[in-house]
Regions:
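Phosphate-binding/catalytic loop of phosphoryl-transfer enzymes
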Residues: 94-173
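Single conserved hydrophobic/aromatic residue that forms the stacking wall/gate
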Residues: 1-3, 172-179
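N-terminal glycine/serine-rich phosphate-binding loop of ATP-dependent small-molecule kinases
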Residues: 1-69
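Short glycine/proline- and acidic residue-enriched helix-loop micro-motifs
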Residues: 22-23, 82-87, 141-145
Length: 179
């Protein structure tokens, strides 16, 4: 895990032998940060892979998929543009997440597929009566103000796990979940 505030940060990870490593570091951008991650992954003494060629795909969690993304998608230029267009809806999340995706592209190149999972996609089947606010409709059209629902990856996991435990078909399950 990397926590960064401007250029100073903390890099924390668990080694292949279970040791917890934590150190203060300088990280000027997402690419430099991701290079630290890959160095830890491939460290000869404590890494979990011999080299980066063992990594066959990369997954990203992005907070806001808006009305554009209803499912997980493979990263391409159109997806990057879509995520960028949604930065105003999640300025603290989508911008840095987009930087992370681009950093992975720089480090791994175009041959390693990347997938994006959107927190809002779980809730994307809400009908308009559930996601519309009692505000002028033009605000919805102009500013995309509506209920999106967040933490969908957690809600999906909880509801699928409950369906498995009950056992009930997930597709026929109506279940309140809280976060």
């Amino acid at each position: 895990m990397c926590i960064r505030d401007r250029e100073s940060g903390v890099f924390s990870h668990k080694t292949s032998d279970g040791r917890q490593m934590k150190k203060s570091v300088t990280m000027k951008d997402h690419t430099e940060t991701f290079q630290m991650v890959t160095a830890a992954l491939t460290d000869p003494k404590a890494g979990v892979v011999k080299d980066l060629s063992e990594i066959s795909a990369i997954g990203h969690r992005v907070a806001q998929g808006g009305a554009i993304f209803h499912n997980s998608v493979l990263v391409n230029d159109e997806v990057l543009e879509g995520i960028e267009s949604l930065i105003p809806l999640a300025p603290l999340h989508n911008g840095p997440e987009l930087d992370g995706i681009r950093a992975c592209q720089q480090v791994f190149g175009p041959d390693v597929p990347q997938c994006v999972v959107f927190d809002t996609s779980f809730h994307s089947t809400m009908p308009p009566k559930a996601y519309m606010y009692a505000i002028p409709y033009e605000y919805y059209e102009k500013y995309q103000i509506r209920r999106y629902g967040f933490h969908g990856t957690s809600h999906r996991y909880v509801s699928k796990h409950c369906a498995h435990l009950m056992p009930v078909s997930y597709t026929h399950l109506t279940l309140p979940t809280t976060y």
